[in-house]
């Protein structure tokens, strides 16, 4: 276990002990006779918990991350918290695969958004004109369709090889906007919908490749409905926040709920 994992588990334990209901907190004790599920968390900023400081290190790892929140549930024991803000598929392969081995029972993986430079697209649409937004969306759509699948295939194959006994959960990305609440900065409702469509396309490609490798895909789209950056109760941070267009505390709680409700304990060895 890495030092960062130990520190995060200690910090998170105090918070979770106050928040979990008695019945839920007692569950691990009843399962004490079974071996713990060795869990390694890989990915980008959506996996590291970026957006909710304080951060443990330059990777933007936060105790708000869904990986830390699910630590201790369903016999899950967070072993290596390797997810790092800014990670691409190439970066993950270069720096995060060492977290995995034959003892790994569960892997969560959030990757792909930085490969298509999704943050740049959103930035263009909310701060520039219609032409800049349309051009950015068109360009990134081509990357999603024609470039990203190959990168994901390579990444997933190497994850599977590095953790041959693990159940791998791939998490998707939320729609960032709630167009029904009107314009957001320079982005009209129509442009917001176009970006949401782009997020849907990204998720569909990630899900398709994940399923081809026998991985489980967890879609968070429905959980974030009506909680876009321009909604009355946003679960995502807006442009003025340093963690712009990443989940807030509520958003990461939604991720944790999505993962724990989707994973069958029988799949965890």
Give, region by region, the residue ranges found by the protein language model.
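Structural recognition of the beta-strand scaffold that forms the well-ordered cores
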Residues: 38-43, 47-49, 78-83, 105-110, ...
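Short amphipathic alpha-helices and their capping/turn segments at secondary-structure boundaries
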Residues: 24-38, 92-109, 113, 151-166, ...
């Amino acid at each position: 276990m890495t030092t960062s994992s130990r520190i995060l588990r200690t910090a998170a334990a105090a918070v979770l002990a106050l928040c979990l209901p008695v019945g839920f907190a007692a569950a691990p004790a009843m399962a004490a006779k079974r071996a713990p599920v060795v869990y390694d968390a890989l990915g980008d900023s959506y996996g590291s918990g970026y957006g909710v400081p304080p951060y443990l290190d330059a990777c933007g790892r936060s105790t708000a991350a869904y990986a830390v929140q699910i630590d201790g549930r369903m016999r899950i024991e967070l072993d290596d918290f390797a997810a790092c803000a800014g990670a691409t598929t190439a970066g993950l392969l270069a720096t995060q695969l060492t977290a995995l081995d034959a003892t790994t029972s569960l892997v969560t993986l959030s990757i792909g958004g930085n490969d298509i430079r999704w943050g740049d697209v959103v930035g263009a649409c909310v701060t520039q004109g219609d032409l800049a937004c349309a051009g950015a969306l068109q360009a990134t759509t081509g990357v999603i369709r024609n470039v990203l699948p190959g990168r994901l295939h390579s990444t997933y194959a190497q994850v599977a090889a590095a953790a041959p006994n693990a159940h791998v959960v791939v998490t998707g990305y939320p729609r960032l906007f709630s167009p029904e609440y009107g314009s957001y900065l320079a982005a009209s409702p129509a442009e917001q919908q176009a970006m949401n469509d782009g997020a849907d396309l990204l998720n569909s490609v990630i899900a398709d490749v994940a399923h081809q490798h026998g991985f489980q895909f967890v879609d968070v789209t429905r959980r974030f409905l009506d909680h876009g950056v321009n909604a009355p109760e946003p679960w995502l941070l807006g442009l003025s926040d340093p963690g712009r267009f990443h989940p807030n505390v509520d958003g990461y709680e939604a991720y944790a709920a999505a993962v724990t409700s989707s994973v069958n304990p029988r799949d965890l060895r």
